[in-house]
Amino acid sequence: MLLRRLSIQWKITLLAGLCLLGVVSLLSGLSVYRTQHSTSLVKQSSTEMLNEAAQARLQSRGEVQAMRIQRYIMDAYQYGKGFSRQVLFLRDQAQKRFLDAYDLREDLTRQVKTALEGNPELLGLYVAFEPDALDGKDKLFAGQGELGSNDAGRFSIYWSQATPGHLESEAMAESLLQDTSPGPSGSAYNAWFTCPKTTGQPCVLDPYFDDVGNKKMLMTSIAFPLELDGKVIGVMGLDISMEKLQEIAVEGSQELYEGQGRVSIVSAAGLLAGHSADASKLSKKLQEVYPNQGTDLLQAIAANHEQVFHQDDQLRVVEPLQPIPGSKPWGVLLEVPQNVLLGPAIELQNELDNQSVQGTVSQLGFGLVAILIGLFAMWLTARGVTRPILNV
């Protein structure tokens, strides 16, 4: 009814306008769709690229941390390996020159002290022989601690320095050498003595707390077998502080995304030797600190293979390391929140979204202007066409 009341001019204008509106809307819609589709592809590919780059960066940081830890432990290992050879050399020379047993024990006690003084980073240094394996005269020196001899006369000297330069010594009693009570890792307390004796190979122990002087300190021990003709006749070992590893963990976390990451150092048995987030967790089992993923993380370390885990909005990278040759692997665990790690990707997505919205608004605006201009042009054209008819 309304159309019948319209003039020919407005009917032509309306029909042409509808056609123009349909064409412009179709072209604008197609343009908006293609723009959004292209933006989506760019967002996806850019996010994947930035995610891979961030993950690669985190893995490279893990390798750097692993190298720092390995270098620290290997320095102590090389020092201990050299000194263990020196101990065997002193024993050999004493036998060849028929050195008095008193002088040999006194000399060994002094050499252990001197070796510890020469390396202030060490907490302790010890030498313990099997019964009568040093000179065959243990009974003559029973209870002579000043000569490194314990209650049974066995040579078992331990020098310690809770503070560099302040040395204390003790002859380790038979009860201490035979203490098999389990520690936090499940190994016997005297693993520092029995491990190299049983395996015939150097051993690095899991972290444990022990008293050095009057201080309880977290440490680990590297123990070496003293072998003669293929038989282990004693053990030489050194204690190193885990404070340095904790420092490495804290420094490493500060370097991760401006301190927003976390670094942990894990022993072969899954005990924390370093934990930047909370020092009170040191010596705790990995499964206690990470109840949801601790077992998987420990399995990755045991497999000696770098792995990446995504859980609880966290990206975790496990980087294994071998503290000393032939030992079971330890590991470095790096953690970064996903939103921090993907910060650049999220910023790029937001920027692309903003540009997409602006582009869509601009296209729709230009389309609307084109429609209005087209309608006005159609109106003028219709007016020119219908004027002669109206004048008849």
Q: What residue spans do the PLM features occupy?
A:
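Non-catalytic regulatory/interaction regions at protein termini and inter-domain linkers
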Residues: 1-10
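Juxtamembrane extracytoplasmic/periplasmic/luminal helical "stalk" adjacent to the first N-terminal
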Residues: 9-14, 19-111, 117-123
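Cytoplasm-proximal transmembrane signaling helix
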Residues: 13-21, 25, 259, 339-392
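Solvent-exposed, extracytoplasmic
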Residues: 107-115, 235, 239-281
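Extracellular/periplasmic ligand-sensing ectodomains of membrane signal-transduction proteins
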Residues: 116-201, 207-214, 272-291
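Membrane-proximal, non-catalytic sensory/regulatory domains of signal-transducing membrane proteins
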Residues: 193, 197-225, 257-262, 290-331
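Conserved beta-strands of PAS-like sensory domains
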Residues: 215-252, 315-321, 327-341
